[in-house]
Amino acid sequence: MARGPTLRASPILVLGGFLIGAEAYGPLVASLERLSGGPVVLMPVSRLDWLLTLFPFGWARLLDRVAPLAAELAARSPSGRITMVGHSSGGILLRLFLADGPFEGRRYSGRCLADTLVMLGSPHTALKATAMRARVARELPGAFFASAESDPVRYVAVAGAIDLAEEAGQASATARRLAPTAYRNSTGDPADRGDGLVPVESALLEGAEAVVLEGVAHGGAFGPVWYGTPAVVERWWAAVASPAGGAASGAA
């Protein structure tokens, strides 16, 4: 992407979730553009790209593409830094992108480029976490750079909570089928509260600002209302746009 003129509002870079196509994020991107007044760029990721993240080199392969895009947007930002939004696994990947330490022979130091990281339904903790998620939790615990002396990052963790009962109309058949096992693997409680895939407890990150949204599912496959639904984007973006430091909750 060629460098353009300096923008009036800080740009936003969005990294979606595991195996979720770009078309799912169209309403989210459009809503953020309207609400923020700045450009919003969705990182292009193929199904193959996501499948390769089962291995460390697959994470590096994706972050190698995030880095130049983030740098170009930051160069045009009035503040010199951008907001990053990660949905599901995308939020975990972006936590790693912020780090200064070596990863697969690279150093990303993304915190020099991003001053805010918003994580939507990201599975930060789990009893049965994948090796890479466990590594991020171990090496970069909590809101790791929130209190850094230089280039601190504001972390905002957004969690959804749906009623799995069919009559509630919040959860799809897929969510009702998968949630008990997914919750058990994360917190040990199959009846936990969550977005149909990720329990609230797992989606909230120690040290991050917390936003819990009732009636919000993990994705379109898990319920009719999810983090990318325009009305829901308005709710979590209001928390991001407000002064840092507060927690929020509410119905979708």
Q: What is each residue range found by the language model?
A:
Residues 2-252:
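Lipid deacylating catalytic domains
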